[in-house]
Amino acid sequence: MHKKLAFFSGFVTLGMMLVLIMGGTVTKTDSGDGCGTDWPLCHGKLIPTNPSVETMIEYSHRVVSGIEGLLIIALAIWTFIAVKHRVDVKIFAFLAFIFMLIQSIIGAGAVIWQQSDAILALHFGISLVSFASLLILTILLFEGDREHQVVSRRLRSHLYGLSIYTMIVVYTGAYVRHLGATYACVGWPICEQEVWTFESYVQMGHRVMAGLLVLYTLYVLYLARKEMNRLIERGMMASLFFILLQVGTGAWIVLGGHATYVPLLHAFLITCYFGILSYLSYHAYRSTARQDGAQLKNMNG
């Protein structure tokens, strides 16, 4: 086991979580234009003078994101040098870097070219994939070459499906924020106003999809229990905990949670949920690949 590398990877993963939360703060406080249309400079300067609150929020997000990007590069290089025999570990280090790079490009584009709400909504989801890649990398480094229980094809397929569907729900949630549709509905869980706007339909659509996500999570947990797969079952129980809290904070936002920390908690919970789900999905893929490899070895033996 590469302990130092594993702990460093864990530190970088926490850094990515901080980047996600700070990005949510930028969106919540409408600070995306806090540095004007300059990037990477802020109002034409390396360090802004007499900054407003919005400028400080946007500038600090850029600084932390830049430091995190350098840490991810260092982690990827260290991983490629130290863990030459593990292709999967190197792949996740590479994915973390690539998605961090894409996220930075979209962030810069939002400042310079004023992207549409539909494009801006991709920003959080891409950052989420980078975080999940770092989390999986960290877990793999701590695990070493440990063997795990094989996951059935049905359970594996539903884990993949749940992961993909989660990304769609995450996108709709980000679109709600960037569209300014957070308070487009009166009441919860159903929009109770007589006149519905486009923003109301977007908000209600996100609620319906989030409700289905909870049901799908329950179903995958049921499958894991039925097949007595303890690792998947424990992981899905943790996922259910986070998604229920996620729905609760969503209702809190609509019903009066106007404080900045409430939507940030909302983003934190879905990040934890997706991180766990991503690892379980890869675990399912990995266990199947090892089973196929063992069968092929027996046939050739």
UniProtKB/Swiss-Prot annotation:
It is a multi-pass membrane protein. One of its GO terms (molecular function) is oxidoreductase activity, acting on NAD(P)H, heme protein as acceptor. GO terms for cellular component: plasma membrane. One of its GO terms (biological process) is heme A biosynthetic process. Disulfide bonds join 35-42, 185-191. Interacts with CtaB. Belongs to the COX15/CtaA family. Type 1 subfamily. This is Heme A synthase. It comes from Exiguobacterium sp. (strain ATCC BAA-1283 / AT1b). The lineage of its organism: Bacteria, Bacillati, Bacillota, Bacilli, Bacillales.
